[in-house]
Structure formats: C-alpha cells, structure tokens
Amino acid sequence: MKTETPSVKIVAIAADEAGQRIDNFLRTQLKGVPKSMIYRILRKGEVRVNKKRIKPEYKLEAGDEVRIPPVRVAEREEEAVSPHLQKVAALADVILYEDDHILVLNKPSGTAVHGGSGLSFGVIEGLRALRPEARFLELVHRLDRDTSGVLLVAKKRSALRSLHEQLREKGMQKDYLALVRGQWQSHVKTVQAPLLKNILQSGERIVRVSQEGKPSETRFKVEERYAFATLVRCSPVTGRTHQIRVHTQYAGHPIAFDDRYGDREFDQQLTEAGTGLKRLFLHAAALKFTHPGTGEVMRIEAPMDNALKRCLQVLRNAK
C-alpha cells in the first residue's frame, strides 16, 4: 500500500480564526484525516504553536504560528473518496453566489449536508474537496437530506458568527415551496404548534406536536392550486427539526413523498397522474439575510430542479 507524505506546514492565524480550539482548527486543515490521528499528533507534541507544545483545548490567538507536521494519508483511504468525485464536481455547478465571506449553493435533493450516520459524503465534505485552498468552510444552517434548495456556507469565522446571530435574532428569512395534499385553505396563514423531538430505538428522529415541545411557528401562503394538491410557500419563524413537514401534516396537508410524515395514497395519486415524482417535494426557494461583510441585504433564490418543475407542469395540464 503506497503512502503520500506532505511537507511541514506553518500557518499564521488570522484575526477571524482566533478563539477556536487547536483540535478544531486542525480538522479544517487536515481534511480527511481521522480525529484519532489528529489527537495523536497533538499528544506527541508534533503540532507546535509558536514553537511550543500545546494541549487539544488550547485556544488560538491572532498572530499564532502553527506548525502542522507531515501526516501520512494511506492510498486506500483516498480511494474511498473516489466514488464521490462526480458528486464533488457536480457541486461546482450548483453554486449560486460566492465571495470572500460566504458561499451559497442550491443543494440537490438526496445529498446530506454532512457526512455521518452511515453517509460518507456530505455537502460540506464535497465543498472542502472542491475548495482545498479554503481555510474555513462551515455550514450556517442545515437542510434535511431530501430537501433541496438554498444552503448558506461561511468562509470566515467572523461571517459564521454574524450569520448565526441573525438566525438567533430572527433576522434571516427563509422561504420554502412545498406541494401538499388537498386544498389548503387560504385563511390558514399561520400554524403554531409546539414540537417535540423523539429518537426511536433505530436511531431515527421523529418529531411530533406536543404541549411538552418547543414553541414553533410557520407562515403559509398559497402559490398555486391543482385538482388534488396545493403548492404553498412556507416561511418558518422558528427553526425546529422537520418543522415544515410536521406543521403541514398537523394542518391536514402532508407534503408529497414525505417518507416520515406523508400520505401514501396522496403519493400514489401523484404517481398515477404521471408526475414522475419520487422525491420529497420540499424546496428551499429563497433566503434573505444581511451580508456579514458589507451589511447589504441580500435575497438569493434557488430554482427548482427538473423533477419538481415537471411534476407541477403535469398537475397544471391536468386541471
């Protein structure tokens, strides 16, 4: 088995990288290297800050000089990434906007935002492979694996802090499009129902409406009506797990092809109508936020994929 030995790297810590732990910083620098190996080189003193040994919990300061030793990466570990090279290349085609502070992409349905839970490939891993020179790439928020649409990534720690503050202060507006069962009543503009998250024995997350849950609110607007379905715009005020999916179900209008909260008869109707749909019809259509560097208010829209467009066209033609 061949191995590849990179050279020693000296990295000067910029102001926006200060405050993070050295172990977390090394994970962004040594992409694909197991955590166990990172802790091993820290323990053995192979990583130095300002020529001194440090502990994994050491917090970096602006101006620190970090010595990163050569790390041997086995060829067979690299081979494990190769099946995903096409997915990595495909990510380049779905970038909607990019500058020195942020990157925004139109996440495809079926791709997780993070590897893990049995998935070796996620959007963030793909972006790091696509942008090996990027010193910082972190998700600002998440989308469910089967949800497509606008996904915001920070390219600086200062940008991540600013955008997270906007999320906390409800300064970020997200708009989703969902195809739901039946005729959504126009007077139902808001669903307020507390949500409780449960973890099943299988490890699967299920969310249900419960008075013991966290306060949750979603606003709705009818976009288009069809014979047995409605396209609604959903704007979550809070950001709970599976919030839109559970709130539409609670309102009596589950989303098309939702394998956890959906309705199989509705899915069958869509299949028999010839829509060709096989994925969850939930799309993050737009995101409005204040740019962390310029202060400009931005609204970025993501077009629907061909599967969703085709489904709507078939339903329109059948009206």
Curated annotation (Swiss-Prot):
Responsible for synthesis of pseudouridine from uracil at positions 955, 2504 and 2580 in 23S ribosomal RNA. InterPro entries: PsdUridine_synth_cat_dom_sf, PsdUridine_synth_RluA-like_CS, PsdUridine_synth_RluC/D, PsdUridine_synth_RsuA/RluA, RluA_PseudoU_synthase, S4_RNA-bd, S4_RNA-bd_sf. Its EC number is 5.4.99.24. The lineage of its organism: Bacteria, Pseudomonadati, Pseudomonadota, Gammaproteobacteria, Enterobacterales. The active site is at residue 144. GO terms for molecular function: 23S rRNA pseudouridine(955/2504/2580) synthase activity; pseudouridine synthase activity; RNA binding. It holds the Pfam family S4. Residues 20-83 form the S4 RNA-binding domain. It catalyses: uridine(955/2504/2580) in 23S rRNA = pseudouridine(955/2504/2580) in 23S rRNA. It is an enzyme of class 5 (isomerase). This is Ribosomal large subunit pseudouridine synthase C. Coiled coil: none annotated.
